Amino acid sequence: MNKFFYSIDNNNNNISFKNHTLIWPSLTLGNIGQLTIDVLICSFEFKRIGFIVDENITPIIGNDCFTTLDNNNGIMSTSIEVYQSSLFPSITLVQQRSPIVDGRIPNFSENLFKWINAEEIKEILFLSSSNANKRVDSQLTGSQVRFIKSDNVDKNIISKLNEMNISEMELTVQSPEGETIQLSNRLTGLAKEIYSTINSKNNDNNNKVSFLCLNLFCSEGYNTNEALQMSNLIYNFIKNQESPSSPQLKTPSCWKLLQGPTFDQSLFF
């Protein structure tokens, strides 16, 4: 396959993804996944190690999303960036800032899956969101996060999710007449394509990759609180024995412009 990942220093030999969990944001309602990745990068010393470059991704370039007044390095942001941290040696974060070209999701998914296998990545974890208005009765109370998994997910992961009070996405519901109604698993776009690919290859002995998606029910709006909630959940999911019990979450400087400038409060006094 064509080169897919480019390291910062053009030397891929110093970077390993073997047995990593790759955390990827879905471009879904409220941008919960992308905002969550922002928080994780800022809070846990994740450093940019490279970029994913593919003809199926809309190219963009912009200002550094994580610049502070005392650390203005003038680093540019690009379409898809890859991050790792010494605090979580088996975790790789991906930040996707631009969409896949219309109609090219299957092509990008194929290239991504080949790269994941070539790098011996253990698991891909999507962070997703879906419309709270479309919940069924059993989803109205309790945790608003559900998981969707491939058939080959490790049982220990399922046990950990259950301990965190995260249930599997409901796929059926009973109608008042007693009929069973099939429900969507809420996957869309790239997550849906990768999920289908991994499940179709379960009988392939060469496929060692598992799929997991954490989906948060939400409404469109100012979704930073939901992103912080999801960040806390992800921390508890990936933390190790040396990690503090409670995370100190930080938000990036670029969040100051999420909703534009604030109003002049003196207008009302």
From Swiss-Prot:
It is found in: Nucleus. It comes from the Eukaryota. Keywords: Chaperone, Nucleus. Transmembrane segments: none annotated. One of its GO terms (cellular component) is nucleus. InterPro entries: Proteasome_assmbl_chaperone_2, Proteasome_assmbl_chp_2_euk, PSMG2_sf. Gene3D superfamilies: PAC-like subunit. GO terms for biological process: proteasome assembly. Chaperone protein which promotes assembly of the 20S proteasome as part of a heterodimer with psmg1. Belongs to the PSMG2 family. Forms a heterodimer with psmg1. This is Proteasome assembly chaperone 2. It comes from Dictyostelium discoideum.
